[in-house]
Amino acid sequence: MEAEVEEEEEDMFEDAVCTTQARVNTPLSVITEAFEDLADLVKPQRSDEIDEDELRLDDFCSACTHVSVLFNCLGFAFKFAEMEYIAKVKDLVEASKTFETLHNILDLDVEKETVKTPGSHSRNLRRVRQGLDLIRAIFEQFLIADDYSLKDAATTAYTEVCAPFHTWAVRTAVYAGMYTLPTRDQLLLRLNETDQSVEKNMRRYMEASRPIIEYIDKLYIERNIKLDW
């Protein structure tokens, strides 16, 4: 009888631990873990297990679908970026039902001469890559600023990553919307993070996303496609 009671108590403890762990899975930590898993697939030390040109499109899309939450947390200022990002990811998700890898979609568009054509998978991949880089740049600027000003961080990041490729009307709307960005405390609340955890998870995302961004850039460069678009 005592043994059964002890076993039940152990089961309850294990359930409690699992529940507690589930509760600490914040949106940012989920994104970070997804990109860390993805980054492991393109790091040189994994070259004996997977060809560096064969990152699966469905795996890539699975990680990318989580990122829209971050754009949503930034509010109105990045509504355009959020809508564009979601639309492009959805297109790639559909493409993953036909194409196995990222380089498959690029090869087809190169053959058809539609790499830069609006709506092509290769163009949409390029825009998704910019979205990932924008989040990375925002985090980077946010952490190096003395006052942790999200407005300053987002303005600098947008100017660096996306502004060169957006029309005047879009740039004007984005810059005007910067004044509606949440405060630092509001952002932490939306992300369900603390001062300590947000810095840790932001740095983890920056580290994990970098090789993915470089990997995508390399796919274009190897096919003699410039990155100035």
Curated annotation (Swiss-Prot):
GO terms for molecular function: ceramide 1-phosphate transfer activity. This is ACD11 homolog protein. Gene3D superfamilies: Glycolipid transfer protein. Keywords: Lipid transport, Transport. One of its GO terms (cellular component) is nucleus. Pfam families: GLTP (PF08718). It comes from the Eukaryota. It comes from Arabidopsis thaliana (Mouse-ear cress). InterPro entries: GLTP_sf (IPR036497), Glycolipid_transfer_prot_dom (IPR014830). Belongs to the GLTP family. An N-acylsphingoid base 1-phosphate binds at residues 84, 88, 123, 127, 166.
